[in-house]
């Protein structure tokens, strides 16, 4: 009987750990960093994208000002980008931009938008913009310059 109980507990523990792993893997989504189709910038490195989104780089080659588009705070895509690209949470990100603004290093903060449709609309309206979308929201109106994670 004790062997049966041990095996039952072991099987239940394995089942629980498998469901936990499935829940974690569901959290891993591919986020694509995108620019308008008309923007001819080549593929970008993670570091280049990080510098652009952190307002450390503010213009494309040729001098055109970069407009950074972010999902609004609380959105899943934003949390993934903050975690995977910046290694920050929302509080750290906010603190970074408050400090940058107070020291004069910040030329223009990213524009927070509520949805993928709004990001795509802004990208369509501004050839110098950069943003991100969940892979499933990417269509032929944008060009992917980096895939996360």
Stretch-by-stretch model annotation:
Residues 2, 21-22:
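Intrinsically disordered, low-complexity and often Lys/Arg-enriched segments
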Residues 1-9:
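Bacterial N-terminal signal peptides that target proteins for export
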Residues 8-19:
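Bacterial N-terminal signal peptides
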């Amino acid at each position: 009987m004790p062997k049966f109980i041990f095996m039952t507990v072991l099987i239940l523990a394995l089942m629980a750990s498998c469901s936990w792993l499935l829940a974690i893997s569901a959290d891993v989504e591919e986020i694509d960093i995108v620019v308008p189709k008309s923007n001819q910038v080549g593929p970008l490195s993670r570091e280049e994208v990080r510098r652009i989104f952190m307002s450390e780089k503010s213009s494309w080659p040729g001098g055109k000002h970069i407009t950074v588009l972010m999902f609004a705070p609380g959105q899943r895509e934003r949390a993934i980008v903050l975690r995977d690209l910046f290694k920050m949470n929302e509080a750290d990100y906010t603190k970074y931009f408050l400090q940058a603004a107070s020291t004069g290093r910040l030329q223009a903060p990213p524009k927070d938008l509520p949805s993928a449709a709004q990001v795509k609309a802004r990208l369509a309206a501004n050839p110098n913009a950069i943003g991100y979308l969940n892979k499933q929201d990417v269509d032929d109106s944008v060009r992917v310059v980096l895939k996360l994670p």
